[in-house]
């Protein structure tokens, strides 16, 4: 296998140390993914440079121009503290004409909207859980095709953010 120069983008809070020795499992859990990616790539013989990115693109540009990575491994899930800006980092990498891992900006934007992404996936005959979108502050009538219990989720929140026990609906009255 050819040795590559790989730039790994991550949130600065998740920059891993060179070794896990001396850390508790709870401490390791914070940056475990980033540590595993960096250490696995290094163990495979690649030249790896981790870079913490939060609010500025200049460090990314400087690393691309100075380190000249053959690929950027993008672990960023937000930029400038907003998960909705993740596609901008991928756009920047495209503009810099550097290969990168993960989805392209358009795919990241489409995936952000749960209703649209589920509709697109369903259209391609890929099974997805039944869902319906209800307008806010209006009376809700559950369609018969949706069996209880249900989980109420935000259309725009990332992953399971905002979901709690109160999000579980077990009766039509709730």
Placement of each model-derived feature along the sequence:
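A short, flexible N-terminal coil/short beta segment enriched in small residues
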Residues: 1-27
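Active-site nucleotide/adenylate-binding loops and adjacent lid/helix of ATP-dependent enzymes
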Residues: 4-10, 64-68, 108-174
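Conserved N-proximal alpha/beta basic substrate-recognition cap immediately N-terminal to
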Residues: 14, 25-133, 158
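Short secondary-structure boundary micro-motifs
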Residues: 23, 82, 151-153
């Amino acid at each position: 296998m050819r040795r590559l120069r790989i730039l790994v983008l991550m949130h600065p809070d998740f920059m891993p140390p060179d070794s896990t020795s001396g850390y508790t499992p709870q401490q390791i859990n914070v940056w475990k993914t980033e540590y595993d990616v960096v250490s696995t790539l290094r163990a495979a013989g690649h030249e790896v440079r981790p870079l913490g990115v939060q609010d500025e693109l200049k460090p990314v540009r400087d690393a691309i121009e100075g380190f000249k990575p053959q690929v950027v491994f993008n672990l960023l899930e937000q930029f400038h503290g907003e998960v909705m800006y993740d596609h901008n980092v991928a756009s920047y990498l495209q503009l810099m004409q550097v290969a990168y891992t993960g989805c392209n900006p358009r795919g990241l934007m489409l995936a952000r909207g749960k209703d649209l992404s589920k509709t697109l996936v369903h259209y391609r005959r890929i099974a997805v859980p039944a869902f319906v979108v209800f307008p806010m502050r209006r009376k809700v009538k559950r369609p018969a095709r949706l069996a209880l219990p249900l989980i109420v989720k935000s259309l725009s929140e990332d992953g399971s953010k905002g979901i709690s026990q109160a999000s579980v609906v077990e009766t039509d009255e709730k």
